[in-house]
């Protein structure tokens, strides 16, 4: 590569580092062009998969302020630059590596920190953002229903207590009226006898 081409390539890779939320560094030795195309499709629109020269990638990472990745830039290197949620792209890379032993995940970075292979795999094992949000919403909905039940419980208990007291008074009032009627009838009967 001529010097101007190298400068342009470094600038492009630097922009990819700066514009991505995460990156996963891989070794692609033994993958065919068809395999790489399949991997790019699996990554989707939120990630790009680029093959690059190690010296240029090292320089671009340094210019982007990313440290701790130099040891990963050995051998045939390709980088998945992730612009959206890193979980889906990491999951796609991990699944592709299971099916294609030629793809080796070396590590990566996220939020400015270097990631080991184990950390990339842990990210891949997480559930997607949408699923986690759905679970959170479900948990919140259940808790809100419980809270509403707790807030409504004292009011319904008071209503049941008031209804029970009213029934009790009605029953006592009916019992109190019956002896009074009997008492008023007794003198009338007494007059009739006399």
UniProtKB/Swiss-Prot annotation:
Keyword Ribonucleoprotein (UniProt): yes
Its biological purpose: Forms part of the ribosomal stalk, playing a central role in the interaction of the ribosome with GTP-bound translation factors.
GO molecular function: large ribosomal subunit rRNA binding; structural constituent of ribosome
GO CC term (a single one): large ribosomal subunit
Keyword Ribosomal protein: yes
Lineage of the species this protein comes from: Bacteria, Bacillati, Actinomycetota, Actinomycetes, Mycobacteriales
Gene3D superfamilies: 3.30.70.1730, 6.10.250.290
Bias type Low complexity, positions: 172-187
Biological process, per Gene Ontology: translation
HAMAP family assigned to the protein according to its UniProt record, in alphabetical order: Ribosomal_uL10
Protein name from the UniProt record: Large ribosomal subunit protein uL10
A family per Pfam: Ribosomal_L10
Chain spans, region Disordered: 172-194
Assembly, per entry: Part of the ribosomal stalk of the 50S ribosomal subunit. The N-terminus interacts with L11 and the large rRNA to form the base of the stalk. The C-terminus forms an elongated spine to which L12 dimers bind in a sequential fashion forming a multimeric L10(L12)X complex.
InterPro entries on file: Ribosomal_uL10, Ribosomal_uL10-like_sf, Ribosomal_uL10_bac, Ribosomal_uL10_bac_type, Ribosomal_uL10_CS_bac
Keyword list, A-Z: Ribonucleoprotein, Ribosomal protein, RNA-binding, rRNA-binding
Family affiliation: Belongs to the universal ribosomal protein uL10 family.
């Amino acid at each position: 590569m001529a010097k101007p081409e190298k400068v342009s390539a470094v600038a492009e890779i630097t922009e990819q580092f700066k514009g991505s939320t995460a990156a996963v560094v891989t070794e692609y030795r033994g993958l065919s062009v068809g395999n790489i195309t399949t991997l790019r499709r699996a990554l989707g629109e939120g990630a790009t998969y680029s093959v690059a020269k190690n010296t240029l990638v090292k320089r671009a990472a340094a210019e982007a302020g990313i440290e701790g990745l130099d040891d990963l830039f050995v051998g045939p290197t390709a980088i998945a630059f992730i612009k959206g949620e890193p979980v889906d792209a990491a999951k796609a890379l991990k699944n592709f590596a299971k099916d294609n032993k030629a793809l080796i995940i070396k590590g990566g970075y996220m939020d400015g920190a270097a990631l080991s292979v184990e950390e990339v795999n842990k990210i891949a094992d997480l559930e997607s953002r949408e699923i986690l949000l759905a679970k959170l919403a479900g948990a919140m909905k259940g808790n809100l229903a419980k809270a509403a039940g707790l807030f409504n419980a004292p009011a319904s208990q008071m209503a049941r207590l008031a209804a029970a007291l009213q029934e009790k008074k009605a029953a006592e009032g009916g019992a109190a009226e019956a002896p009074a009627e009997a008492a008023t009838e007794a003198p009338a009967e007494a007059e009739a006898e006399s």
